[in-house]
Amino acid sequence: MSFNTFGHMFRVTTFGESHGVAIGCVVDGCPPMIPLTEADIQGDLDRRRPGQSRFTTQRQEPDQVKILSGVMAHPETGVQVTTGTPIGLLIENTDQRSKDYSEIKDKFRPGHADFTYEAKYGLRDYRGGGRSSARETATRVAAGAIARKVLPDVKVRGALVQMGPHKIDREKWDWDEVARNPFFCPDKDKAAFFETYLDGIRKSGSSIGAVLEIVAEGVPAGLGAPIYAKLDSDLAGAMMTINAVKGVEIGAGFGAAELTGEENADEMRTGNDGTRFLSNHAGGVLGGISTGQPVVVRFAVKPTSSILQPRLTVDRQGADTEIMTKGRHDPCVGIRAVPVGEAMMACVLADHFIRDRGQVGR
């Protein structure tokens, strides 16, 4: 299996499976002399870690990261810094229950990658989905924590803005509220509603989808390049690599189709700090290049395919059968995808930041 690496100058290669010994990644292209410890990474991993509420999978993984390479104590200050060489990160798996999947090893789970992996490779790791499991995203979050260190002046934040058909009230958006509830929801009232709503979904053995919004503030104008290296193109592609993501939009996105030209175009005026925009329908990107406005990306996450309901399927021999998935699963996988979306945003921005320095010397 190839294509386990993303990025151009800031490159991330991930490895490992859901029920393997460990998962991990190698981050290549990180500049030297950046202070970096395991504690710098652990905070982001803890936000994504499973089993922290009844609304996520009850798999108990501590997700303790180990830095294997690419750092050393600065010879003068003693502070641990990056060396410019590949940074190896490892996260051990400690709470696998492969026996939960023994009954489905010959059946394809509807909505999962079982059928397509088997069609391509002739076999699949049925134990928790193997490489296709969202377990892999822990490594991206670890890489994203390093990317944030490359971009100290950029703040990347994410939130859940819709669950099922229920959207937040944007007039009540409060970033501080995101850390106060298990849904990463910026609307206090809607977070309380989601608690009751998702409890009902969870107890019925079903699942529900969500829409997440990732915002990067402090991004300088000029990142990205025309045509085939557009910043928004890379962001959309990065978000689409996240498990269960089925749609991505930048700025106004699909909503722009409902606007007139005068409504959609972000007008400009001269301000104290240079050019300022009167709106941000573009989501901080024009012509594939950042404008200096906040970069705004939203993506839709489908309902978790593993549900406690019988489903029609076929087996490896091509016979019709039924399947009911056991194991521990998220009733709304979109919840824990918020830190993953933040990580992918940070990695893409770090990549473009380094590429921009090489191209125009900023």
Curated annotation (Swiss-Prot):
Reduced FMN (FMNH(2)). GO terms for molecular function: chorismate synthase activity; FMN binding. It is an enzyme of class 4 (lyase). The keyword Cell inner membrane does not apply. Gene3D superfamilies: Chorismate synthase AroC. GO terms for cellular component: cytosol. Its cofactor is FMNH2. FMN binds at residues 131-133, 243-244, 287, 302-306, 328. InterPro entries: Chorismate_synth (IPR000453), Chorismate_synth_AroC_sf (IPR035904), Chorismate_synthase_CS (IPR020541). Pfam families: Chorismate_synt. Disulfide bonds: none annotated. Pathway: Metabolic intermediate biosynthesis; chorismate biosynthesis; chorismate from D-erythrose 4-phosphate and phosphoenolpyruvate: step 7/7. PROSITE patterns: CHORISMATE_SYNTHASE_1, CHORISMATE_SYNTHASE_2, CHORISMATE_SYNTHASE_3. Belongs to the chorismate synthase family. Homotetramer. This reaction introduces a second double bond into the aromatic ring system. This is Chorismate synthase. It comes from Bradyrhizobium diazoefficiens (strain JCM 10833 / BCRC 13528 / IAM 13628 / NBRC 14792 / USDA 110).
